[in-house]
């Protein structure tokens, strides 16, 4: 049964930039909003100096009040465990500095590359593998974008541009229109892929102007949402996805397997069901990238495979995402089938 988007009733008409501006950045305010005692999080609050906190109201609305183990809360609340210096964890686990060919470009793969349109995000996820990335060396402005466009134009093997970040939808619609127009003028480009978490934390970001932009481009357009738990999907998000479906955007999702958040086959099965009900196909289930500050989210490979095999037994094959790990320097992601 499909999730039939209802007429949104909460903040749907509110400008997404206003919601973004009002995002909570003080852990104490987040705890207060969720009816959680500040005294229980004294050490965790200190971890904000390692990686700032940022959570917009639409995402906070999905978190269960009074529950310190809520899976959405655990993804965004700073933790004293981030101070742990775990073996094998680093500030650049994918060695992306080696692929930073020119500002705003990560050229890891043969026929596609990542275009770092914007460095900021609407929400700071504590497991983010780019939490230490040098965004100041990759400014999201037209001057640096032009250097990136020149690089793409000079590499005829590039068929697909992947908007990444940060979050590329932090760019305003007129900025995205400028970028897409210039990409369309590069004849060897066929596809535009947009990786984003913004629609699930601020669904209002999917504006009519943005949808029109994607409807009119000659490039085949794919959006990959970043959703880890079924509780992140609500009717307002479903409405936003309906707008994208209406303009023939291919919708996929990737998740990260996170201890305490979604390390359960039944939860992943429900996630796949809800994604499909909103017109999104499960794409990747990533093993954690070993970024410094996120070791408390790590699940062993053995446990991950057990969860994955159980998931395969619970649902249809097309609803099972590919279990994958990105290994620095490899020409593609490494898949784990059995």
From Swiss-Prot:
Swiss-Prot/TrEMBL keywords: 4Fe-4S, Iron, Iron-sulfur, Isomerase, Metal-binding, Pyridoxal phosphate, S-adenosyl-L-methionine
Chain positions recorded as [4Fe-4S] cluster binding sites: 121, 125, 128
Top-rank EC class of the record's enzyme: isomerase
Positions of disulphide bridges: none
Pfam families reported in the protein's UniProt record: Fer4_12 (PF13353), Radical_SAM (PF04055)
Comment on bound cofactor: Binds 1 [4Fe-4S] cluster. The cluster is coordinated with 3 cysteines and an exchangeable S-adenosyl-L-methionine.
InterPro entries for the chain: Aldolase_TIM, EpmB, Lys_aminomutase/Glu_NH3_mut, rSAM
One GO MF term: 4 iron, 4 sulfur cluster binding
Source taxon at top rank: Bacteria
EC number of the protein: 5.4.3.-
Reaction equation(s) it catalyzes: L-lysine = D-beta-lysine
Cofactor: [4Fe-4S] cluster; pyridoxal 5'-phosphate
Keyword Repeat recorded: no
Function: With EpmA is involved in the beta-lysylation step of the post-translational modification of translation elongation factor P (EF-P) on 'Lys-34'. EpmB appears to act before EpmA. Displays lysine 2,3-aminomutase activity, producing (R)-beta-lysine from (S)-alpha-lysine (L-lysine).
Assigned protein family: Belongs to the radical SAM superfamily. KamA family.
Protein name, as recorded: L-lysine 2,3-aminomutase
Species name: Haemophilus influenzae (strain ATCC 51907 / DSM 11121 / KW20 / Rd)
